[in-house]
Amino acid sequence: MAEQVTLSRTQVCGILREELYQNDAFHQADTHIFIIMGASGDLAKKKIYPTIWWLFRDGLLPKETFIVGYARSQLTVDDIQKQSEPFFKATPEERPKLEEFFTRNSYVVGQYDDPASYKHLNSYINALHQGMQANHLFYLALPPTVYEAVTKNIQETCMSQTGFNRIIVEKPFGRDLQSSNQLSNHISSLFREDQIYRIDHYLDKEMVQNLMVLRFANRIFGPIWNGDNIVCVILTFKEPFGTEGRGGYFDEFGIIRDVMQSHLLQMLCLVAMEKPATTDSDDVRNEKVKVLKCISEVETDNVILGQYVGNPNGEGEAANGYLDDPTVPRGSTTATFAAAVLYVKNERWDGVPFILRCGKALNERKAEVRLQFRDIPGDIFHQKCKRNELVIRMQPNEAVYTTMMTKKPGMFFNPEESELDLTYGNKYKNVKLPGAYERLILDVFCGCQMHFVRTDELREGWRIFTPLLHKIEREKPQPFPYVYGSRGPTEADELMRRVGFQYKGTYKGTHKH
């Protein structure tokens, strides 16, 4: 058994600092101005300010980093602190550090479509670094409706003339291929691709990165990672909660846009892509684009849509269905669950179904990749053997394990299912790594774009799903109902069986969710 390693947060941060400071792309001595556009909003309050605080607390930001909030609301830094501090989870011992953090914060009031406001912002930023070399990082925590005006004004007025400029853009990146192309063309006309960071919070999960190492650093997997040995691949993203009063926003996009076309499609690329020439960002993203180009538009016959209804035995939120959310339009047919089958039409994966499924108000919280291997040829054990599976689970508890057949103790050849545990968490016990948001923000400071979506990736992803989305919006099919807290609609299980997946509900492994 591997020796267990227990590292404190201080030790982990020390290792990360050493890695960062040895990285030429991490300009430790430079002045950095981190500008939060939309600083008065929920995203800034709940995610961005807390993330910047955690990085500052742990000494993972360049020493001369200043944070500037920008929004229309008449606020002060004290107001920002009151709004965001409850999400910082700061301990009493961290109060002095917290006060130091807010001395590096400032707030500028301005309009999003007013050139004069941006001239004022630019003057303020320049005063911070007093004409010295400085790098500007703009986080657009804004609705997409104002992206065009904001990016145009930033490019015309607020760009650093002495350092680098980087723009962080939040999803959704459009609603379909046409709107996405329109937004991409606009942003690409203003900034180079190496300045654009389209953030997908899911892409920097530690286990998502580990998938690449698992595939390409272990010879044992290379010969079997193909359609000759794998019968199907299942990519799952399940949430145990519903819209919880925020259905109005969700109803505009639905589960396909929210999860499937983004998170799950990115996971599919990492499973299916060929080995990149290097681990450089563009080499990895080149291979992901090649995979996407091999996928045809999703066919309606290979899609199941569902919408949760209240659980008659449930309590609180579980007793309510999607349509009981007062913010959801009456009679909405928006899907809260979707299962779709895609095929990668190349030599490695020809004929192998990639089953994508995601949903809200399901029976558990889980995100995983499951590769199910083909049946044993020439079975001598009287069909008692189950299919082998390799499971890479991202949440809730990161795990890597494979299910295998071993002999049951006794006189005769009775196979039974067991696990071969590859989970690195068993070795690195209680090691707390930075979360996805922290890692992604650090990537922006370092100029690493591997975990950000490139323009051509975005275009290919929308190409695959746009015809389906338009058909759904045009015809408004009634989604299959499923009870809050269930596995989802039974029709989805039938679709999975139809394309070759075998459900093994009898096996109870050691990896509880």
From Swiss-Prot:
A single GO BP: glucose metabolic process
Active site: 263 (proton acceptor)
Binding site for NADP(+) 2: 357, 366, 370, 393, 421-423, 487, 503
UniProt modification remark: Acetylated by ELP3; acetylation inhibits its homodimerization and enzyme activity. Deacetylated by SIRT2; deacetylation stimulates its enzyme activity.
Organism domain of life: Eukaryota
Job of this protein: Catalyzes the rate-limiting step of the oxidative pentose-phosphate pathway, which represents a route for the dissimilation of carbohydrates besides glycolysis. The main function of this enzyme is to provide reducing power (NADPH) and pentose phosphates for fatty acid and nucleic acid synthesis.
Miscellaneous comment text of the record: Has NADP both as cofactor (bound to the N-terminal domain) and as structural element bound to the C-terminal domain.
NCBIfam families per record: zwf (TIGR00871)
Name this polypeptide is given: Glucose-6-phosphate 1-dehydrogenase 2
Organism: Mus musculus
